[in-house]
């Protein structure tokens, strides 16, 4: 089975966290993320996808050191037209300032209130939010 890797950023606002960003697909909400290109690093991929999908630049956000959430699952890949084993890597990023979100690849976006536990999508979104909550509590 083909192995693929995608990377993205869980974007949060304020300290302490007040809200987090999700992008609207046709039938679901998701994090800004995408596939690794060439020989880029995971962080380079995550930052590139964040810029492409939201307009958030590297200067707008701080990736919090020590947070790197990973999950793996099988997916029917539209990109490759076959079932693939996907590794997803998510970084936690805190905005440094207010920014205008420009959803270039999605229908819309929304800032969801930070009110754990979250019930959005069990496989990835809820799990990464729970891990981010634990990380933020222990790294105040």
Segments predicted by a language model, with ranges:
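Conserved N-terminal beta-strand and adjoining loop/helix that marks the start
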Residues: 1-19
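NUDIX/MutT-family hydrolases
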Residues: 90-94, 99-132
